[in-house]
Amino acid sequence: MCIRDRLRFSRRTQGQLNRWAARYGMKLNPKDQMYHAKNSCAGRYTAVNLTNADTVEIRLFRGTLKLNTLTATLQLVNHLCEVAVSMSDQELQDMSWFDFLDQITEPELIQYLKERRLYVNLSLIHI
């Protein structure tokens, strides 16, 4: 998925992402990526924190008090989890940002994406 679009959705600057939600780096094989993520010394300030054995923490997003932003963020993370569980490693690697968004059906998330010009598809929701 396009890093620029994920950065815009996260409401963080590149510097904030590097400090609070760093990436583990890219490995060629998803199994190597998971092993590296679980066994690295990166600490908890990574985009997906796997430090605790029974917890997965998504740290990409800035905090918010706005209900529509919170709702859209939770819906995006839910969709991300659904996609990750239902697709093969190769399908995930081949997926674009727009392929990912095409499967979204939650009207609040669609509206949020449209308002921020992250996705435009007028057939999905009628304003």
Predicted regions and their residues:
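Conserved small/polar residues in nucleotide/adenosyl-binding loops
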Residues: M1-D5, I125-I127
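Aromatic/basic-lined ligand-recognition segments
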Residues: R4-R62
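Charged/polar, solvent-exposed surface patches and flexible loops
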Residues: D5, R19, A72-Q75, H79, ...
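Flexible helix-coil linker/hinge segments at domain or subdomain boundaries
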Residues: R8-T13, E82-L118
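Short, exposed beta-strand "edge-strand" segments with a Pro/Gly-rich flavor and a Y/T-containing core
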Residues: L60-L65, D94
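An acidic, glycine-/histidine-flanked metal-binding catalytic module
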Residues: K66-D89
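C-terminal helix/juxtamembrane-tail motif
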Residues: Y119-L124
